[in-house]
Amino acid sequence: MNATLRIRNRPVAESTYTSLRGAKAEVVRVEREEREIHPKPPFETGTMLQAATRRLRLSSERVMQLAQDLFEGGLITYHRTDSTRVSEEGKRVARDYIRANFDPEDYNPRTWEPEAEHVEGAHECIRPTRPADAEELRTMVREGAIQTTVTLTSHHLRLYDLVFRRFVASQMKPAKVLYQEAVLEVEVKGVPVAELELSGVLEIVEPGFTKVLTEYDLPAYGIRETPELEEGDRLEIGDVEVLERHEEYPYDQSELVEDMRERGLGRPSTYAQIVEKLFRRGYVYEVPQRRWIFPTTRGEAVYEYLSTHYERFVSEETTRDLEERMDAVALGKAEYQEEMEKLYLELERVVEMPDPEP
């Protein structure tokens, strides 16, 4: 059982660490309630990249290549999409798998219509094309029941597994869990010095969509186990660690893609390309252990030059505006030729600007 005590002052943290070693804790309050947990929508490109880069520890570019292979092999739907919509065919795939492997009552179809205006209507979510999980797919390929355009590697199958489980879960009933929140009062030599909060799931009452997930998937849905506690229980504090954590951390690739998506920068077809280009041009580098991304000296110099001399043209607002104008053309809300003329005039003004001092 682990608990975290957040202290913003280093000296206080260090003195607290010394005090807590060998201390006692008493449970002073326990609250339990049954909660309903709903599945997440199926993957679109952004959420697939976030999950896959983190779970598979692969680059965004590599994940997109694996997805391209799966798509070309007819194993998943189109992987460059910002839609979570599920077609009737998709619902049928989920229904057939759920009825064959779980209780038919677990099937709870949802369309997951996207709310954003710019979402491409023709595309649906990223989903499997047949009611076969990764193990069944491996068997069918090995036995020749399915012919693929590429040799499926373990990475292909692991990505397929992520897509498959996320999709099938999205078409199943919510789960019901017994949730517990407990407050522990920490004592040193009989004197209360701190309070710790422990919360988590005691029991999954009705599994629902969690039947198709693995234990590694559950924390993403807020399902973390916690031991049953009662008021008056007394516990001994075991190992104590002091860890320094910053308020903000550098991006990893999954977080960078997530932030781009939230800010309206890039589209499903360009997320991985943008990240890959930053690496290829030497603007950023990645720390292997943590997979954090940092700017290089070259990247900082290029950013400084462009933001100083062409601030408006390379700003986040201009980028987002251009994306929205392109979406408007795609949706038939704006004329292609008119938007091209506007863009040409904007570019012309930049070209005619006097060269900045070196």
Swiss-Prot record:
Main subcellular localisation: cytoplasm
A Pfam family the protein falls into: Topoisom_bac
Entry-linked InterPro entries: Reverse_gyrase, Topo_IA_cen, Topo_IA_cen_sub1, Topo_IA_cen_sub3, Topo_IA_core_domain, Topo_IA_DNA-bd_dom
Keyword Isomerase set for record: yes
Signal peptide per UniProt: none
Gene3D superfamilies in the cross-refs: 2.60.510.20, Topoisomerase I, domain 2, Topoisomerase I, domain 4
Domain Topo IA-type catalytic: 1-351
Record-annotated membrane-spanning stretches: none
EC numbers: 5.6.2.-
Keyword terms, alphabetized: Cytoplasm, DNA-binding, Isomerase, Topoisomerase
Compartment(s): Cytoplasm
Disulfide-linked positions: none
Annotated GO CC locations: cytoplasm
Cofactor: Mg(2+)
UniProt xrefs under PANTHER family: REVERSE GYRASE
Free-text comment about domains: Introduction of positive supercoils requires the cooperation of both the helicase-like and topoisomerase domains of the 2 subunits. The helicase-like domain probably does not directly unwind DNA, but more likely acts by driving ATP-dependent conformational changes within the whole enzyme.
Subunit record text: Heterodimer of an RgyrA and RgyrB subunit. The topoisomerase domain is shared between the two subunits.
Function: Modifies the topological state of DNA by introducing positive supercoils in an ATP-dependent process; dATP also allows positive supercoiling. Increases the linking number in steps of +1. Only this subunit binds DNA, in isolation it does not hydrolyze ATP. Hydrolyzes ATP only in the presence of DNA. Transiently cleaves a single DNA strand and remains covalently bound to the 5' DNA end probably through a tyrosine residue. It changes linking number in steps of one, and nicks DNA preferentially at 5'-CNNN | 3'-sites with a strong preference for 4 pyrimidine residues.
Name this polypeptide is given: Reverse gyrase subunit A
Organism this protein belongs to: Methanopyrus kandleri (strain AV19 / DSM 6324 / JCM 9639 / NBRC 100938)
Gene name of the record: rgyA
